[in-house]
Amino acid sequence: MLRPVLAALILYAVSLILSTSTHAQTVSWSNRQWRVTNGGMAGVARGNPENVHIDANGYLHLAITQREGKWTSSELFTTDRLGFGTYQWVVEGDVYAMDPSTVLGLFTYGPTAHIGVDAENEIDIEFSQWGNTCGDCNADFTVYPSTGHRVKEGKSAWEDNFHVTGGNVTTARMEWSSTRITFTLMKGTQPIGSTANVIKTETYESTTENIPQVPLPVGINLWCFKKTPSKDQTVIIRSFEYTAK
């Protein structure tokens, strides 16, 4: 017969296994494996795997919502690292007019795989009004420097904050090489290589010090900047594609 304390410990361990297995920590989507996180994302609303799911069409759903009285957000990363090439997401939802505190990030990021420190090895396409702190901006393109070249106070090597309008479906693309990154937003669903219905495009050219040089995980997150939203937020990512250069 098991002693009461030992029996209690076993029951507790079983309950943990059951609770963590009810929602996948790793998902298969767009022909890649993705690790769903419970990251802090600026500390306002932690990620919760229950906020990430894939529907019958194969679309990825992300949410910011309250669970057990606390606001929670969404974040996932590829389990592999990708290098120079073309990265493309098709996004469904009016990402140009979300709650001002909401941020949708489409990015590559090094620290999640222990590549350098924060504010290095990161390339971002972000949709956000940043709590109305950037004039009338609702999106940005941002590049952080390569390993060992962190800018003072963790600032980016380059960024462009801007205001644009688009439809309910947006194709977001970045083309990354050792000395050049081209960012493009397009209305509707566009194939890789197309430049139809361009909303915004910008190219950053610089030295290898200012542009990441190593393969990085790909991340997608929906999170809160400094405060929580006035109501639940949802975004759908229809697809992600990558073509190596």
Segments (PLM) and residue ranges:
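Beta-strand-rich interaction surfaces with strong enrichment in secreted/lumenal proteins
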Residues: 73-80, 156-163, 208
